[in-house]
Amino acid sequence: MAYKIRYRPTALAQLASIFDHITARNPTGARRVITAIKHRIDLLETFPHSAKESEIPGIREMPIVRYPYVVFYAVDDDAQEVWILRVRHTSQDPTHHLD
């Protein structure tokens, strides 16, 4: 059975911020980046444990291929849910304010 993808409000706000930031310079590029991020997140429905564990126990980090972003998420196997916690640029401190 597929896991349900759920987003923390912070993760949704970060996706919107990424889109807005890139759109200011390249609207087509912004759509490509967000599509790539969402495609990788969608894979977690089937493969929730595919990304490596982060330094923080219980949190995984999934790099976005071709783009400098990382998705941080947690898996709840009992509820069969994947919680998207943060979407960060790779230049940012990866563990700052993770919850």
List PLM regions with ranges.
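Basic, Lys/Arg-enriched alpha-helical interface segments
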Residues: 1-59, 77-78, 85
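Enriched for short, Lys/Arg-rich terminal
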Residues: 31, 70, 74-99
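Short acidic/glycine-enriched loop/turn segments that link adjacent beta-strands
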Residues: 56-58, 66-69, 91
